[in-house]
Design a protein with these regions (language model features):
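Compact integral membrane and secretory-pathway proteins
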Residues: 1-129
Length: 129
């Protein structure tokens, strides 16, 4: 799910009446620059990868913490509806988020799935003690 999300349209933007469609990989590249304007949702990716790896180890608490943190950070993506997205350095071309594409929903679902799996594993472990 996560890998496929990188190839599918993730963000659908409007700029001067034109529709721009950013696939997931472009969102990742642009997300690195978004850190400069306090848009931290790009950090959900390394947190997600760390959580996925930690769920395969006995560190269930740390894996759950990473997964929940990834989910919280990824949720900041919804604030993009209220943020100007600058497409050039001069501020001439400013886009606004129109809607999310299937890539976004797959990306977000993968993070939700890992967070739920981490919490279920942690809950099962606590009940077996």
């Amino acid at each position: 799910m996560y890998g496929i999300a990188w190839m599918l349209p993730a963000l659908i933007l409007k700029c001067h009446g034109q529709t721009l469609i950013w696939p997931g990989y472009e969102c990742v590249l642009q997300g690195l620059l978004a850190l400069l304007i306090a848009q931290i949702e790009i950090l959900a990716n390394p947190l997600f990868i760390a959580a996925s790896c930690l769920l395969l180890t006995p560190n269930k608490k740390i894996g759950a913490a990473f997964a929940i943190t990834a989910l919280i950070v990824a949720t900041q993506t919804f604030t993009l509806f209220k943020v100007d997205i600058y497409l050039d350095e001069g501020g001439v071309n400013i886009a606004h988020l129109n809607s999310f594409g299937p890539g976004f929903y797959l990306w977000y679902s993968a993070i939700v799935l890992v967070a739920v799996a981490a919490c279920v594993r942690l809950w099962r472990k606590s009940r077996s003690i």
